[in-house]
Curated annotation (Swiss-Prot):
Name of the protein this chain belongs to: 3,4-dihydroxy-2-butanone 4-phosphate synthase
SUBUNIT field: Homodimer.
Species this protein is from: Syntrophotalea carbinolica (strain DSM 2380 / NBRC 103641 / GraBd1)
Phylogenetic lineage: Bacteria, Pseudomonadati, Thermodesulfobacteriota, Desulfuromonadia, Desulfuromonadales
Residues carrying the site annotation Essential for catalytic activity: 136, 174
HAMAP family, per the entry: RibB
Annotated binding of D-ribulose 5-phosphate, by residue: 37-38, 42, 150-154, 174
Length: 217
């Protein structure tokens, strides 16, 4: 990864602290992975606080496949199975069945409807019956252990939400360029500066978590 581009947002630990601060303000963060992996940046928001305006930004600026990152325990509570029994995707992205709130939505595809679905799903008292299947929100299962187990955007999103004091649930969507191609780090940095967003890498998160574990040992 081109560290020189990320350096304008501080050191790895400073980038993590800045991302946590922005999330606590209810703002979005761009989470990037290694250029030898997906080499993509995901716009992420806390599931608890995402607004219709923020969702509209995700739909407008990103790929359109809005995902809700959840823990295994939460997915068991919602009785959401994996989309396929044999996951053959290159990066083992763990999609479940897609969902829609049963109440409070129309077609389910608008920004407001997707926020309603997300708020419904992450509520502590949400029951499986509160969600229709399929729908326009795509849950993802985060592996236990977070980015120290899998260097994925899903795990990074859940880890960041925990670090910011939220429920371990976040919303993500992959940033794209105007021509529909995937945004790479230079474009991600430009987008972040234009919209006053912070950028943090999955490797930054792993470093912060490993450092915390060493201090706690």
């Amino acid at each position: 990864m081109s560290q020189s581009l990320l350096d304008r947002f501080g050191t790895p630990l400073e980038r993590v602290h800045l991302a946590i601060d922005r999330l606590r303000q209810g703002r979005g963060v761009l989470l990037v992975d290694d250029e030898n992996r997906e080499n993509e940046g995901d716009l992420i928001f806390p599931a608890e606080t995402i607004t219709p305006a923020q969702m509209a930004m995700m739909i407008r600026e990103c790929s359109g496949i809005v995902c809700l990152c959840l823990t295994e325990d939460k997915l068991k509570q919602l009785e959401l199975p994996q989309m396929v029994s044999d996951n053959t995707s290159a990066n083992q992205t763990a999609f479940t069945l897609s969902i829609e709130a049963r109440q409070g939505v129309t077609t389910g595809v608008s920004a407001a409807d997707r926020v309603t679905t997300i708020r419904t799903a992450v509520a502590d008292d949400c029951r499986p019956d509160d969600l229709a299947r399929p729908g326009h929100v795509f849950p993802l299962r985060a592996r236990p252990g977070g980015v120290l187990t899998r260097r994925g955007h899903t795990e990074g999103t859940v880890d960041l939400m925990r670090m910011a004091g939220y429920k371990p649930a976040g919303v993500l969507c992959e940033l794209t360029n105007e021509d529909g191609t995937m945004a790479r780090l230079p474009e991600i940095i430009t987008f972040a500066e234009r919209h006053y967003l912070s950028v943090v890498s999955i490797e930054d998160l792993a470093l912060a978590l490993e450092s915390h574990m060493e201090k706690s040992a």
